[in-house]
Amino acid sequence: MKQILCFGDSNTYGLIPATKDRYDWNTRWTGILSKKIEKNGYRVVEEGLCGRTTIFEDATRKDRKGADLLPIILETHKPIDTVVLMLGTNDCKTAYGATAEKIGSGIELLIKQIKDSDPDINIILVSPIELGEGVGEEGFDIEFNENSV
């Protein structure tokens, strides 16, 4: 059986933004993917964590820096055929003041870590989601502002 590691943030975790609850397995994109491909000999490993970044350490929520965690997770789940890398949204938080180039450098580091663990691993890179309209307005996540988009 081939394994697909889905490494990401709250979007991979399946966070319901309005309630902070979690979507059930059948609703999360990782669960939907799993159902579609399991009959073809694939197993989906879900590694989503709310607040996870590429290279930034959150001062109030420890162990969110993907670059520190990814090598351990890769080793834990060996052998891995494919990694779906879906990070970068939290890197846009106001506290980090990151440029697109800095976020891109973080993604490059994660890709290097994946290839260092096994040069034959396939990588699917998923772009960070669009934060959408309303960033910086009342009711929107206060960790983001107009400079985050």
Q: Residues of each region from the PLM?
A:
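Catalytic metal-binding/acid-base residues of hydrolase active sites
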Residues: 11-12, 50, 90, 129
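Alpha-helical cap/lid subdomain in secreted, periplasmic
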Residues: 31, 63-149
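Serine-esterase "nucleophile elbow" of acetyl-processing enzymes
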Residues: 1-49, 55-60, 72-76
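A short acidic, helix-capping loop that chelates divalent metal ions and anchors anionic groups
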Residues: 14-17, 52-57, 91-96, 134-136
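Aromatic-enriched hydrophobic runs in primary sequence
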Residues: 7, 15, 37, 42-50, ...
